[in-house]
Amino acid sequence: MSNNYTSLSSSLDEEMGLKAGHEIDLEGSPPSEHNSEEKSTLPSNSDILTSANPVSQASETPDHSIESNTGSTQSPTSHSLLLKFSFCIVYYFYFAIVVLGCVLPFEHTHTFLIAFLVIFGIISVILFSGSIYYYETWTKTVKHFLKKVISPFKKEYIVCAFLKTFVFYGLLKTIEHFLVLLSGDKWGWKCSTLSSILTPVSCISFCLNESVQLRSCSTHLFINTVAWIKSLGGGKNAFENNYNQLNETSPEDLV
């Protein structure tokens, strides 16, 4: 009996199998080389950890700049407190010397010369300490003061400063008048000297206070008084109308 067995795979299938095997062999060898190259180019585990947690290493390293900044901020505060304390002591001591100079009569020339030298020395110390005290803040003070003068909406601060100076000068002149009436003319030049010294100092102090420390108690009182006057006049428009009418009227009509 003859064997009539025939394979189910045709010649076309064999050719396809050869082609498939050839492609597999060609694709098999390059991936190993490619994978080896990729393994060499991949970052190590330590690099991955450092890139994933940069904050932990930064927190471990001490920051010397922060320590230096904290140290620099602590020293100027104590220095400024010392300057303020010394400035206040010198200022009040100078005020006491001026008052004693007005009270004590100077009959001898040597006493007057000694008192003049003492007062001159105290004034020099005050100017020196004041220049040191305002060394860091005088630019800000001048800038704020110029803004208050130039700005048309904030001139009430400067008005309040000059009103304070005027009231202070009037108080000094009243005291001078009563002292002259009680004790004679010998108090005249002393009190006038005191008022001439304290008036510019008070004017500068009030202006600086109103320009740096905005809206003090007296400024609030002034603004509230103006607002109350406007409310009594029926609002802002009525107040402006009354003000314009007063400006248009002549002095003869007012009499």
Swiss-Prot record:
Membrane protein topology class: Multi-pass membrane protein
Keywords per UniProt: Membrane, Transmembrane, Transmembrane helix
Biased composition (Polar residues): 41-60, 67-78
Record field: transmembrane: 85-105, 112-132, 162-182
Annotated spans, Disordered: 19-78
The keyword Transmembrane helix is assigned to this record: yes
GO biological process, alphabetically ordered: meiotic drive
Main location per the UniProt record: membrane
Subcellular location: Spore membrane
GO cellular component, one term: cytoplasm
Free-text function comment from the UniProt entry: May act in meiotic drive.
Family, similarity comment: Belongs to the WTF family.
Name listed for the protein in its UniProt record: Wtf element wtf15
